[in-house]
C-alpha cells in the first residue's frame, strides 16, 4: 500500500502568459494528490486563456470590418466601392447648391413689370413723333393765339386767307413807330403763302398795312433782352436793302415760332 501511495507520476506543465504565448515547458514529478490539483489548475488556466482569446477576437472584428473596404478594393472592386461612396457624397452638395440657387434666385430676382401693349395706330403715331425734329415738335406743341371769328369788326380778308389755307402764320406783335420810335403799338400780323407780311389794327380792323415781300428781305435777327429793364424783351429785326423795322414779343415761344416760319417762307421763295 505504501508503494502505491508513494508512487510518483511525471507530468508535463505548460505555462502560458496573458497574451496566450507559451513561456516554458517543465517536467515535474507529482504525487497522486498533487496531480489532481495540477489538472484542475490546468483546466482553469486553459479556460482563462480561451476567454482572453475570445475578447481579443471581438476587439479585432471592428478593425477587420473597417479594413474590408480596402480588401475589396485590393481585389479589383475599388471602382465600385469608391464610386458608391463618392456618388453619395457628391449628390448631397449638388442638391444643396441647387436648393440654395433656387432660394437666392427667388430672393434676388427683381419683379418684372409688364408694360401694356400699344395698338398699331398708337405705335405708328409715336414712331412719327419720334422721327420729327425737335424744333418741329416744339412748334407743334405751341401755336400763338389768333383772332377769333366772333370779332365782327375785323377785316374779312383775315378769315378768308385762313379758310383758303393761304395763311402761314398769324398773331399779335408789337411794332415800333418810325416817327416816335420810343412808342410801341400792338398790331395783328399775317404772313401769307406768297410771302407777304402785312398787319392790321389789334382788333383786325382797317385795311392791311406793311405788305412787305419777305422774298426781298436780306436778313432776320432775333435776340432776348432782360425783361426787368425792357418792355417786350423778345425782339426781331427784319432787314431789307433800303430799310428795316423792329418787332417785339412778350414771350419767347411766340418769337421763336414767328422767326422759324419767316425763315422757312424765305427759303422756300428763294429756291
Swiss-Prot record:
Residue ranges under compositional bias (Basic and acidic residues)? 42-64, 92-120, 128-140
**SUPFAM superfamilies this protein is in?**
PH domain-like
What residue range is the signal peptide? Answer: none
Q: What SMART domains is this protein classified in?
A: PH
Q: Which InterPro entries match?
A: PH-like_dom_sf, PH_domain
Name the Gene3D superfamilies on file.
Pleckstrin-homology domain (PH domain)/Phosphotyrosine-binding domain (PTB) (2.30.29.30)
Q: Where is the PH domain?
A: 166-267
* Stretches for region Disordered: 26-145
What is the name attached to this protein's record? Answer: PH domain-containing protein ECU06_0670
Q: Taxonomic classification, please?
A: Eukaryota, Fungi, Fungi incertae sedis, Microsporidia, Unikaryonidae
